[in-house]
Amino acid sequence: MQSEKIAQLKAALQNFSASNSDLFDYALEEEKAKVRKRALLLLDQRARSVYELTNRLISADFDPNIVEYVVEDLVRANLLNDENFSREWVRQRRQRRGKSRQALTRELRDKGIKSEIIADVVGDIQPEDEQDIARELAYKKVRSLKKEPCDYPEYQKVLRRTVGVLARRGFSQSMALEIAREAIDARIDEIRR
């Protein structure tokens, strides 16, 4: 049995020697190294989804097959993980930008995240938290109001601007309108005192 294995190994070595090929494809490995270096530089700038990184590398004129291999390698090494990316993206965008569930879902979809991951990550957001964020944004916007609106058109102008701030962050029109009115009325009460 052992002699059979030795014979098979000798035959394999002779076939390899006869083929005059290298054990490694140096040109391919150099290309992979270039793509890997660029990928790591991009990931060093900020976290990215698999889709984003793949598109950036392909748009940099790298061979799509090599890009695919390098991206798979980064996923195996856990340097690229769509679920971790999504959770961190949602956390940061909610804290720093006050984005709604709807806006975050759209952003993650644009970044090529699978719908199951989006549902899981965005599903953790409670409706009460969403209202609190909208309320905070509305109160921040109306703080710039220095005097009470003198007439209905001026009130509508302030309302429109406040609703616009909330709408751009993806909050529903009904929620934005309700919270904007609440914030404006509270600010008017403060001004009157």
Swiss-Prot record:
It is found in: Cytoplasm. The keyword Cytoplasm applies. Pfam families: RecX_HTH1, RecX_HTH2, RecX_HTH3. GO terms for biological process: regulation of DNA repair. Gene3D superfamilies: Winged helix-like DNA-binding domain superfamily/Winged helix DNA-binding domain (1.10.10.10). The keyword Cytoplasm applies. One of its GO terms (cellular component) is cytoplasm. Keywords: Cytoplasm. It comes from the Bacteria. Modulates RecA activity. Belongs to the RecX family. PANTHER family: REGULATORY PROTEIN RECX FAMILY PROTEIN. This is Regulatory protein RecX. The lineage of its organism: Bacteria, Bacillati, Actinomycetota, Actinomycetes, Mycobacteriales. The gene is recX.
